[in-house]
Amino acid sequence: MNKLALYCRPGFEKELAAEISEKAAELGIFGFARVEENQGYVIFECYQTDDADRLAREIPFNQLIFARQMIVVSDLLTDLPVQDRISPIIQQYQAIAHQINLTYSTELLVETADTNEAKSLSAFCRKFTVPLRQALKKQGWLQGTRHHKQGLTLHILMLDSTQCYVGYSYNYNHSEHFMGIPRLKFPLDAPSRSTLKLEEAILTFLSREEEKKRLNEQMYAVDLGACPGGWTYQLVKRGLFVYAVDHGKMAASLHDTGRIEHCAEDGFKFQPPKRSKIDWLVCDMVEQPSRISQLILKWLVNGWCHETIFNLKLPMKKRYLEVKKCLQMIEESLEKQGFRYHIQAKHLYHDREEITVHIAVKSLD
């Protein structure tokens, strides 16, 4: 298997192709990306047979911005017999069983791309999963427990009922979610659907233990461009006191909590109140990404906060280039100022033409 399949939001295939090509080249691995617009995935074909497996192990998945999932895959299986789709799939796994330990594989996911056309296969995928799982277990595979981090997850990427890619991902270096998509329910008392963006960001960037330590009732936050309160809602729910900065009105339900102070000011001019030590800054303002990046830097460099989650709205063209430029500017500025920091960026499921960035400033040298 010399290919990687990487899932993404339809329309962002070119950005993902550029990103995976760059990350592979940094490891001295070369190949080419097969890209079809709006198909919801990219196939990166390596020139050397074992290189796809190496990429799946050595490129930290959490450093990929546009990828929802990363799996090593076979050549495309076509013309699967309607009466026996399982045997060709088993044969693909048998061909790699001497190299990859499939015994302690933990889970089987029969998936599609995140497109309307592909989703029409979802009922088929559910039905097909049961007999395929049984057949894999008969081979002595899928014997691991689900949370076995050193194990593998087996993936079947169905293009239609007769075509699929057969593959696997490493449990320590993949998305644990089906199709790479977290299933979040919209809270009925939240002021806007944007609340799901911050919830997904917190779940993506922080472990459960980190969330409890770093987002709690002893902390203060500032939400720039807060109206009507979708992001503020997530912070208040976790017990933080929030300075909600926006000329627009905040939802009455948030005022009723007693955990917010509405500051009717411009988010670019607002400065934190001296009486409070601000732990978190969040920002979902619609503005040029370079301007938002400069704003976030101002807060971090001035010591006004030590952790932040913010969105960068992307231009119509050269989106990956713009992302790289903004993140590089932030990193270089923090390093120049002597900061130690941790930065992550992700094109979340609930993001559209934007990415979400998390930065934690650890300390000053």
UniProtKB/Swiss-Prot annotation:
S-adenosyl-L-methionine binds at residues 194, 227-230, 246, 266, 284. It catalyses: cytidine(2498) in 23S rRNA + S-adenosyl-L-methionine = 2'-O-methylcytidine(2498) in 23S rRNA + S-adenosyl-L-homocysteine + H(+). It comes from the Bacteria. Keywords: Cytoplasm, Methyltransferase, rRNA processing, S-adenosyl-L-methionine, Transferase. One of its GO terms (molecular function) is S-adenosylmethionine-dependent methyltransferase activity. One of its GO terms (cellular component) is cytoplasm. It is an enzyme of class 2 (transferase). InterPro entries: RlmM_FDX (IPR040739), RlmM_THUMP-like (IPR048646), RNA_MeTrfase_FtsJ_dom (IPR002877), rRNA_MeTrfase_M (IPR011224), SAM-dependent_MTases_sf (IPR029063). The active site is at residue 313. Its main location: cytoplasm. SUPFAM superfamilies: S-adenosyl-L-methionine-dependent methyltransferases. Its EC number is 2.1.1.186. Monomer. Belongs to the class I-like SAM-binding methyltransferase superfamily. RNA methyltransferase RlmE family. RlmM subfamily. Catalyzes the 2'-O-methylation at nucleotide C2498 in 23S rRNA. HAMAP family: 23SrRNA_methyltr_M. NCBIfam families: PRK11760.1. This is Ribosomal RNA large subunit methyltransferase M. It comes from Pasteurella multocida (strain Pm70). The lineage of its organism: Bacteria, Pseudomonadati, Pseudomonadota, Gammaproteobacteria, Pasteurellales. The gene is rlmM.
